[in-house]
């Protein structure tokens, strides 16, 4: 590798590349979430018959992974670059390897392996065939073909490529700590994020108000159900995301037992499944507007038969 790209140059390179492959460049969704997969740009759009190609950076919060800004690789919040393509291109793996080349990583000069790691997200009733992508022994990407999202079978199949930006940048810049990553010329990752990492870790593990969080979960769940009763999928999904983040805060604080944990996950999953079914029903009511006219007319005729 010649020039060591900054963190923001890595993002810009990936954005331009996937834009050239036909992806819309979306912006990070403005609600806390544990992974880019939970964005409505992936979760909702991966289901139903309409095509969808999108790429976006997603800050992902995992309260239990916080380490007060002291661990070089474990973070309360990390950044994912998410690519979602439906239907999945037959050459999606080749497209991915080409993206690495643009980042200065030549597949002929490095040990790049696709290690089978089938993916499942119990909170959203989602699963798929998956692989971890290992670069010289370090995982940098999760590669998934969705089989089920929100309890619904995906047809056509959606391909998801999730780059771990911190890990990728650490490798490209040859640094051992994420806090030493150069975000922009002259500005280190730690100068931006170390203090927030410390404060969020302290809040998650020591300060958070458990009683308030428990009450909030109940209120968010009730509001999500109320929205779904009125077929308001997107407001409902916002509250489902709030339920998920609130549960993660409770879990990090040790406020839920093993039995209670399973119960909370089931409650979130049930909401996600209803949201998924409602979303598909609403898209059908609208006539699947992203389908071409011939496919739309054929599909609607088959569903009415």
Swiss-Prot record:
User: What keywords appear on the UniProt entry?
Assistant: Aminoacyl-tRNA synthetase, ATP-binding, Cytoplasm, Ligase, Nucleotide-binding, Protein biosynthesis
Tell me which domain of life the UniProt entry assigns to the organism this sequence originates from. Answer: Bacteria
Q: Where does the record say this protein resides?
A: Cytoplasm
Q: What is its EC number?
A: 6.1.1.14
Gene3D superfamilies per record: Bira Bifunctional Protein, Domain 2, Class II aaRS and biotin synthetases, domain 2
What Gene Ontology cellular component terms go with this record? Answer: cytosol
Per the record, the GO terms for biological process are: glycyl-tRNA aminoacylation
Family designation: Belongs to the class-II aminoacyl-tRNA synthetase family.
Q: What is this protein called?
A: Glycine--tRNA ligase alpha subunit
Tell me the organism's taxonomic lineage.
Answer: Bacteria, Bacillati, Bacillota, Bacilli, Lactobacillales
């Amino acid at each position: 590798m010649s020039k060591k790209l900054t963190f923001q140059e890595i993002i810009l390179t990936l954005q331009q590349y996937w834009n050239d492959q036909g992806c819309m460049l979306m912006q990070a969704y403005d609600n806390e979430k544990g992974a880019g997969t939970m964005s409505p740009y992936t979760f909702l759009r991966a289901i139903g018959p309409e095509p969808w190609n999108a790429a976006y950076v997603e800050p992902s919060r995992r309260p239990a992974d916080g380490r007060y800004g002291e661990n070089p690789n474990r973070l309360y919040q990390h950044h994912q670059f998410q690519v979602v393509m439906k239907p999945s291109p037959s050459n999606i793996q080749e497209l991915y390897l080409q993206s690495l080349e643009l980042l200065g990583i030549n597949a002929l000069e490095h040990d790049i392996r696709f290690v089978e790691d089938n993916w499942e997200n119990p909170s959203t009733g989602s699963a798929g065939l998956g692989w971890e992508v290992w670069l010289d022994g370090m995982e940098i990407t999760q590669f998934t073909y969705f089989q089920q999202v929100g309890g619904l079978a995906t047809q056509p199949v959606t391909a998801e490529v999730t780059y771990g930006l911190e890990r990728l940048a650490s490798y490209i810049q040859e640094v051992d700590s994420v806090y030493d990553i150069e975000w922009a010329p002259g500005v280190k990752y730690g100068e931006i994020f170390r203090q927030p990492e410390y404060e969020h870790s302290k809040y998650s593990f020591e300060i958070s108000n458990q009683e308030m969080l428990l009450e909030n979960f109940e209120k968010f769940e009730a509001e999500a159900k109320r929205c779904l009763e009125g077929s308001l999928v997107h407001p409902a999904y916002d509250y489902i995301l709030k339920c998920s983040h609130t549960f993660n805060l409770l879990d990090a604080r040790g406020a839920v037992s093993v039995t209670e944990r399973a119960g909370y996950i089931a409650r979130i999953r049930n909401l996600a499944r209803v949201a998924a079914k409602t979303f598909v029903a609403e898209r059908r009511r609208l006539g699947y507007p992203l389908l071409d006219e011939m496919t739309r007319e054929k599909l609607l005729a088959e569903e009415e038969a």
